[in-house]
A protein has these predicted regions:
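Alpha-helical scaffold domains
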Residues: 1-128
């Protein structure tokens, strides 16, 4: 998809050393799912640079402000959480633990995809 292939190499790289408020605004107030998706997928650049804070913070926005997320947004958030977990699995586990029960199932499944089977089952039992 063009959004996924272009937003983090372009927008993410451009924002690497700048204020990232734009991504939060897109995630929270994007008029289309594609604008909202850009808000989270652009954080891939930061994840690859070891900067995970924005990914977790924007993921939190989707949990708090979007009661019925489109499945493409659930998948994107789960994907970026999984990528963040590849850099810091303990941080992802700690982030997920209090949220798994309120996360959309698709988002949770994507985020724990690389966990060992026993851990995956644990989080799935916490989930909806």
């Amino acid at each position: 998809d063009l959004v996924d292939l272009s937003c983090y190499p372009l927008l993410g790289v451009w924002l690497l050393d700048k204020d990232r408020t734009l991504l939060y605004d897109l995630a929270r107030n994007g008029k289309t799912i594609w604008e909202q998706r850009i808000g989270i997928v652009s954080t891939m650049t930061f994840v690859r640079a070891g900067q995970l804070d924005d990914t977790f913070a924007i993921a939190e926005l989707f949990l708090n402000e979007n009661e019925h997320l489109h499945d493409l947004l659930e998948k994107a958030v789960g994907w970026l959480l999984r990528e963040a977990g590849k850099r810091d699995s303990e941080r992802l586990a700690n982030w997920l633990y209090p949220r798994a029960s309120s996360m959309p199932r698709t988002m949770l499944r994507y985020s724990i995809e690389k966990f060992p089977e026993i851990e995956r089952q644990h989080y799935l039992k916490l989930g909806k």
